[in-house]
Amino acid sequence: MKAVTGKRLAKLAESKGWELARIKGSHHIYVKEGRIERVVIPIHGNKTLKIGLQRSLMKIIPVAEGDL
């Protein structure tokens, strides 16, 4: 799996219809109408996300590996 930054995953979430609800520190919180879950994406400059967090967020959004 290709490593991805929080900034890149946030852009992909927005392209899938998720809206930025608020920002608390470096954590961007996204919501989508009709969904109960929130997506919290940590954006720490150009640091890549850890693999477990990346997989979890990709399942919720949903994003395919080919979209990265």
Labelled PLM ranges:
Residues 20-23:
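Short beta-strand
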Residues 31-34:
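Active-site beta-strand termini and strand-to-loop segments that position acidic
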Residues 4-17:
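Amphipathic alpha-helical segments
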Residues 45-68:
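C-terminal structural segments of small proteins and small subunits
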Residues 39-43:
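Recognition helix of helix-turn-helix/homeodomain-like DNA-binding domains
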